[in-house]
């Protein structure tokens, strides 16, 4: 149902949909190979939007049965008794929390000393505490050195930063150490298109590659690998091709972890502001003090807003709690227009709603929150 709507949109907008594997023949031509054979197509412009795929590691060979990527994890036919998630990032924690709720004993192994390193540190600590309450276990500062698959499970050898070795058995292992751009098999090097050291396509501010007629957007170009970022780039790219002047503010692309509770963020973290020596203020408000959160049995978490000490302009915001992904949109909008915490504080928010927590966090920048 989710994907069939795309086919409808193709028909509605009179777009020809070709199914097959494509690669460049030259700068103006692609070859499409399908079950019906091969055919070349020429065009004035091309947009490469081939997405990304899970990073593979030789020591952890994926078979999508016992050692799986996020794709394989969604196709498991039964709930594994034990699941090891390799990587404490967004996708691994999302998948791990799902299987934990379904009954798996989930362990997360992460090479760093914290989960989701891009996340605001205070939020990350609260997030891990919440996941631990749900039964997830964490092995931080550990890396997987080898795996051995058998009928009885997967023996996983791990090493800590202090060189201690351990081996444990799991029913299923989920590989989630990041994603890579899907640029292989397109013959990009063959036509002279430039890639960076991570095999992402190099583009300018108008999504144009070093080849005049070829553009690229989404996960195949540098930047966060987020569907909504790719969508914005797709629209902007076509507008550039048609002579318009679109705008994307990459400093305020929201990021959301779809767990329970959700985690949402936009803009700068506290550590980033400290490193940049920016003088800032913090306003926080707990959902425990929000009437709607209490009546829906979701009092966990809080809203955190960071604002410039002098101008009061919002520099970043971080939310952990129910519907965090919905609540962050108001702050993203405010930031897009260069708004301040006072702008949010002065807006009437409906009662009872969890959005009131955003208003109170904004008010608390100056210690004016009412309900705490």
Task: Give, region by region, the residue ranges found by the protein language model.
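A conserved short coil-to-beta-strand element within the FAD-binding core of flavoproteins
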Residues: 16-30, 140-153
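Glycine-rich dinucleotide-binding loop and its adjacent helix/turn
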Residues: 48-105, 109, 134-138, 189-210
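Core beta-strand elements of the Rossmann-like FAD/NAD(P) dinucleotide-binding domain
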Residues: 36-45, 163-172, 210
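Glycine/serine-rich phosphate-binding loop and adjoining beta1-alpha1 elements at the start
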Residues: 19, 25-66
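A short alpha-helix-loop-beta-strand transition element characteristic
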Residues: 16, 53-55, 138-139, 194-197, ...
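Flexible, glycine-rich terminal cap/loop adjacent to redox cofactors
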Residues: 242, 259-269, 274-372
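Rossmann-like dinucleotide-binding cores of NAD(P)H-dependent redox enzymes
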Residues: 1-3, 7, 74-75, 80-84, ...
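FAD-site-proximal beta/loop scaffold in flavoenzymes
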Residues: 63-80, 168-242
């Amino acid at each position: 149902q989710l994907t069939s709507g795309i086919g409808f949109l193709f028909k509605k907008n009179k777009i020809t949909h070709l199914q097959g594997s494509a690669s460049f023949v030259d700068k103006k031509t692609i070859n499409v190979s399908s079950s019906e054979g091969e055919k070349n197509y020429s065009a004035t412009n091309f947009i490469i939007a081939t997405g990304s795929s899970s990073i593979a590691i030789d020591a952890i060979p994926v078979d999508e049965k016992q050692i799986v990527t996020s794709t394989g994890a969604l196709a498991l036919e039964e709930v594994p008794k034990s699941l090891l998630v390799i990587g404490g990032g967004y996708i691994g924690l999302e998948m791990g929390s799902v299987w934990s709720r379904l009954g798996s004993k989930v362990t997360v192994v992460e090479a760093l000393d914290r989960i989701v390193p891009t996340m605001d540190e205070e939020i990350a600590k609260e997030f891990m505490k919440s996941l631990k309450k749900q039964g997830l276990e964490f092995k931080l500062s550990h890396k997987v050195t080898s795996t051995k698959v058998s009928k009885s499970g997967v023996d996983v050898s791990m090493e800590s930063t202090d060189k201690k070795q351990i081996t444990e058995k799991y029913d299923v292992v989920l590989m989630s150490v990041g994603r890579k751009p899907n640029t292989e098999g397109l013959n990009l090097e063959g036509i002279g298109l430039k890639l960076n050291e991570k095999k992402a396509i190099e583009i300018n501010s108008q999504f144009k590659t070093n080849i005049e007629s070829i553009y690229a957007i989404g996960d195949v170009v540098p930047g966060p690998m987020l569907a909504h970022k790719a969508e914005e780039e797709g629209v902007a790219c076509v507008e550039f091709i048609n002579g318009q002047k679109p705008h994307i503010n990459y400093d305020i692309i929201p990021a959301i972890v779809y767990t329970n509770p959700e985690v949402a963020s936009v803009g700068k973290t506290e550590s980033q502001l400290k490193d940049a020596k920016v003088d800032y203020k913090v306003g926080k408000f707990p959902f425990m003090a929000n009437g709607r959160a209490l009546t829906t049995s979701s009092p966990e978490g809080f809203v955190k807003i960071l604002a410039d000490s002098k101008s009061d302009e919002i520099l970043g915001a971080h939310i952990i709690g129910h519907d965090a992904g919905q609540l962050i949109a108001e702050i993203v909008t405010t930031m897009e227009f260069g708004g301040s915490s006072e702008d949010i504080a002065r807006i009437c928010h409906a009662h009872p709603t969890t959005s009131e927590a955003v208003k109170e966090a904004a008010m608390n920048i100056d210690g004016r929150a009412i309900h705490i």
